[in-house]
Amino acid sequence: MKKLLVSILASLFFVSYANAGPSLSGLYLELGTAAVGVEMDGNFNDDDGDISYGTVGKTAVTGSYGLGFMTSREKPISFDLGYAVTPGSAKIKATSDNTATDVTMEVSDGTEWYVVAMANITEDASVYFKYGGNDADITVTGDINNPGGLSGTTVALGTVMSWGSNMYIRTEAGKTDYDQISATGKGTAGGIGTDVKVTADPTVHYGKIAIGFKF
């Protein structure tokens, strides 16, 4: 899916630029790709009650698609309401000599709803502030309890530039702070004890480019 979205964006980018048309407004479909950096600050509480602290990070390129409604940009201030989906999954795996303590955690199917307030420099160029709510599914395997879904909030700054009469290009840079997640052992024989606990605070920084199509 990610490769398909990137290919579509690349193809559209090299289409001949059309003359600017009327101010964009109404329903739209959007395809985007983002460079993402994930940081997790956390701690590990072992069987002896000792607590270890640490930070891990990872980068990735993701694809997304969304649907939204944009009010007319003919006025100085306009608004954009939307919903976006980031398909795919990412796995974190921990193994040891004792296979009974092996654990895999998978985060998948990220979603976001958002509200955007735009300051319109012209009918074809806008800058904006975005606020959004984010959710993702978490699946675990191994002798550990599922910490539940992942939820958070996003703040971002961006630009929207009209491209022809019914398309636009969006650029955006933002940060998503997820709620703290915590998982404990199930305590099965030979597995992970119930007094073992892992806690993490995930944060995502990203830069995004997207192309939108007005219906």
Model regions: which residues?
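Cleavable N-terminal export/targeting peptides
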Residues: 1-26
